[in-house]
Amino acid sequence: MSPRDVVAGVGALAVGLVLAGCAASRIEHGTFHSAKGYQVTLPGDGWRVETGGDADLALRRDAPPGGMLADATCEGRSLQYPLPILARHLTFGFTDRTTVESATEIVNGRPAERALVRGTVDGREVSAEAVVVKGARCIHDFLYVAPSSDFDAGRRDFRAFVESLSGDSR
């Protein structure tokens, strides 16, 4: 199994944890506009939109390999859970899971939880950075996953992606 297959498997796992995106979402001038009312700026340098997933937005890069997603949950019980628990849920499915770092922070004026996790998926060592941001009406999930050997190559893009969050979700 190639690192790309590992990233695809982890991406599918993460996507399965989030709600379905809406068809009215669009991309204009490098910005993703979610039908749920928020926006994020797309990273450059080889990242492409993956269609057909359940997240509002899923991105993949072949070289170096990696995947990231953005999603918002605007109803249901998950809105009541503490941010650290929600961040942990984004990396369910990892075996030999180790939390390397976790921190409570602010993303564009909103409370957030960030966790860096290493583990094994389908026999391959991967790393993930999960960020959960609490908006006025929604929880925003961001996830970046890559083979551990390639993880640092996409981390700056992921952080810029998360920090670009704007708008007031419905």
What is each PLM-predicted segment?
Residues M1-A12:
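Bacterial N-terminal signal peptides that target proteins for export
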Residues V40, P84, R88, F92, ...:
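Solvent-exposed, polar/charged alpha-helical surfaces in well-ordered, non-transmembrane soluble domains
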Residues G44-W47, H140-R170:
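Surface-exposed amphipathic alpha-helical segments
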Residues V18-G21:
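C-terminal motif of bacterial Sec signal peptides marking the signal peptidase cleavage site
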Residues A23-S25:
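Bacterial signal peptide processing site
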Residues H29-L57:
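Post-signal peptide N-terminal segment of mature Sec-exported envelope proteins
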Residues V49-D141, A146:
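Conserved polar/disulfide-associated segments of primarily extracytoplasmic proteins
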